[in-house]
Amino acid sequence: MATSLSVSPSLSLNTLFIAKALPLSRPSFLSLPLPKSLLSLSTRRRTFIVRAESQNGRDPVPAHYDFDLFTIGAGSGGVRARRFAANYGASVAICELPFSTISSETTGVGGTCVIRGCVPKKLLVYASKFSHEFEESNGFGWRYDSEPKHDWSSFIANKNAELQRLTGIYKNILNNAGVKLIEGHGKMIDPHTVDVNGKLYSAKHILVAVGGRPFIPDIPGKELAIDSDAALDLPTKPVKIAIVGGGYIALEFAGIFNGLKSEVHVFIRQKKVLRGFDEEIRDFVEEQMSVRGIEFHTEESPQAITKSADGSFSLKTNKGTVDGFSHIMFATGRRPNTQNLGLESVGVKLAKDGAIEVDEYSQTSVYSIWAVGDVTNRINLTPVALMEGGALVKTLFQDNPTKPDYRAVPSAVFSQPPIGQVGLTEEQAVQQYGDIDIFTANFRPLKATLSGLPDRVFMKLVVCAKTNEVLGLHMCGEDAPEIVQGFAVALKARLTKADFDATVGIHPSAAEEFVTMRTPTRKIRKSESSEGKSGSQAKAAAGV
């Protein structure tokens, strides 16, 4: 027998914590006005019948739902949430567009990461690194009768075959979990209904996990340029490419095409690449990429693109025009992919950039609609989307309201050389803690002693001077992402510099440097240095 409950949709999940803390019997507890998102959380494998408030504010009417959870978007966060929800007994459906390798507007099961993001990009990174390794091998006695050549067409075909395989795996995972996969474009009709290609589906909860799409600035000739989606699936390898942007996507593709022997020019509006990263890392990676032949054009903003009679392209900036490009690529950020979903028509609030506004539990302004991943523009990383999806399922189907934990989230830039980081930058640590100790190492790795190449490694620890806790860990050099992933556990556990010092290193390795740096490169004492000083003097002394 179904139970009808009337609750206020405006209440937050914090009500649950308050209710649990009160000395009430179960009947009294159930009479409290709990949020709709927490009703019937333990109900398994059945259609929910509750009282849903009508949009015009009239008396609630009984509602019958096809699913407990309906998800729009089959990317990393959505798949995690759907699969876990199904495992907990919920009836789940998901809608996604057909497979496509090029456009974020036509995606496929697996989303950005699997089809036009992390996975294909990393495969391109692997392909491009061989040229550097061929150069390194000469110093180790390797000789080649002829210079190795790269077959772009066969590589792209192999890459696409792998993406198809991964998409198939994702579909099998959903199928085995009992999730209904619906192919098509989903659009919100009301807080509990989604239209997929003309057919309506109702659900107690709706999750939006549609990710993001590349952003191209509105300048004359922008239609002549490509974005990061297209760059992963070009019919021919660039001969000379202009990459507009100074973020991680720009640097990763700069390294890729440089390794594949294209002439690479990077145009950035700022003085430095990677805004938001540690300042020393920013300087070091640009220097190392320049040594490898990549040309950086700083403080240059794109103004127009033109095409010549010979088919080449010219890029005009505020400082002049550079001609002769076979490709011009924009890596100028991404935007949440919230267009044509009907979100605002049902009351979901969006930020200026189109991101879905959510609370700390991933709930939108509409009580029955939730959102995770890049579409919320919180921390746009695949593992973070997975975490958000897992936390949401605990909130909805395990009677365990759970917030995603964003402290000490590691990240990487698969540039060449790559970057790994976790925790605070030096600049952030100074602002938050004031007194900090900085440990750095800048050295030539063992491999470079025989290769003869000018490769170097930079490593950095940011330590709180008062508590000795390691606040930040940064590295730029070979295998940096792999090394930093392990140390992320240490920062998550709030280990101290003394813990690092007490750890035996692996020799010879670059990683051991993190546990053998004993003497601070510099000590920043914001409280002491600011005493008796003001203005720019105090800021400079504090390292700001």
From Swiss-Prot:
Binding site for NADP(+): G246, I249, E252, R269, R275, G333, A412
SUPFAM superfamilies in alphabetical order: FAD/NAD(P)-binding domain (SSF51905), FAD/NAD-linked reductases, dimerisation (C-terminal) domain (SSF55424)
Targeting presequence: 1-52
Reaction catalyzed: 2 glutathione + NADP(+) = glutathione disulfide + NADPH + H(+)
Annotated cofactor note: Binds 1 FAD per subunit.
One Gene Ontology MF term: glutathione-disulfide reductase (NADPH) activity
Residues the entry annotates as binding FAD: S76, G77, E96, T112, C113, K121, G186, D374, T382, H507
Entry EC no(s): 1.8.1.7
Binding site for glutathione: S76, Y170
Alphabetized PROSITE patterns for the sequence: PYRIDINE_REDOX_1
Annotated Pfam families: Pyr_redox_2, Pyr_redox_dim
Region (Disordered): 519-544
Keywords: Chloroplast, Disulfide bond, FAD, Flavoprotein, NADP, Oxidoreductase, Plastid, Redox-active center, Transit peptide
Domain of life: Eukaryota
Disulfide bonding pattern of the chain: C113-C118
Main location: plastid
Active site (catalytic residues): H507 (proton acceptor)
GO biological process, one term: cell redox homeostasis
Subcellular location(s) of the protein: Plastid, Chloroplast
One GO CC term, this protein: cytoplasm
Primary role: Catalyzes the reduction of glutathione disulfide (GSSG) to reduced glutathione (GSH). Maintains high levels of GSH in the chloroplast.
Subunit structure: Homodimer.
Miscellaneous remark of the record: The active site is a redox-active disulfide bond.
Family statement: Belongs to the class-I pyridine nucleotide-disulfide oxidoreductase family.
Name of the protein in its database record: Glutathione reductase, chloroplastic
Originating organism: Glycine max
